Amino acid sequence: MVRRYYLSILAMVALHLGAIAQPRIEQGNTQVWYGRVNQWTVSRQILRNELNLMKECGVNGYMIELAVWDGVDDKWSNEWIVRTQKNYRWLLRECRKRKIWLFVSIINDNMGKGKYGDTGPTLEKVYESALQLASIVKRGGSKGVIVQPVAETQTPTGQRFEQECRKILENFTLVYNGEGGHPKSTPEGFHFRAVHPAHIVSSVADDALVISDHGLIIRELSIDGGLESRGNPQKVSMWVKRLQQQGVAVVGYYAFKYDKFDPATIRALGEALK
């Protein structure tokens, strides 16, 4: 009798945990994600505000670039690596508490090419340090984490880093974003492909994770046409609804270089699915 009672309790706990896990990523059941991808380390209080509102509104994923453009002078130093690990572990805990996916893009293959004001080193020059970022992700564990090793893969070094991450992160859900951000398929070893459409009205494949990581669409979805601006809720809602009708699995809004709380855009993402 006692044994049966405890078994029933365990079954109820298992059902409860399953019910509150991150939603499955699948075509025909669109979910929306948000992230201040290059400014996520600016303020933990802003992150708390964002994550709490996302949970309330049904926004199911937070997106970051681990090699963040946070304006620091010591980027790629040992001190920066340690600080990045602390920030990542904190955010990972907060996302797990709320059952929100953490989408981690480790590096961008555009780095060091001067795009959007990036004057740092190329991946080739900081390759070993970049591998330390992959190790940070590994140490955090795979639960609730989706990893894009390289954004917009386009160089031999980026391809090599991608393959090394496949080995380091073999138990993780991996996303491919090769061919400069417009992959035509999902290669072996990856679970999904992410595409970066140029415009709100750009055609995308049904099976892709659709992320607004392109200079043109970032401007189109912003309130004033800028790269460092908050979102335009009406345009964001229209974009999400269009892709939901198509049945894509994920629509992700990149708050590219915005460093403040943007509740109107987060609400627009969630309400667009209703």
Model regions: which residues?
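Bacterial N-terminal signal peptides that target proteins for export
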Residues: 1-9
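Active-site mouth of glycoside hydrolases
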Residues: 24-185, 189
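Extracellular glycoside hydrolase catalytic/binding regions
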Residues: 128, 144-259, 263
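Extended, alpha-helix-rich binding/interface surfaces that flank or overlap catalytic cores
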Residues: 259-274
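Positively charged, low-complexity intrinsically disordered regions
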Residues: 4-5, 17, 23-25, 32
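Hydrophobic h-region of N-terminal signal peptides that target proteins for export
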Residues: 10-20
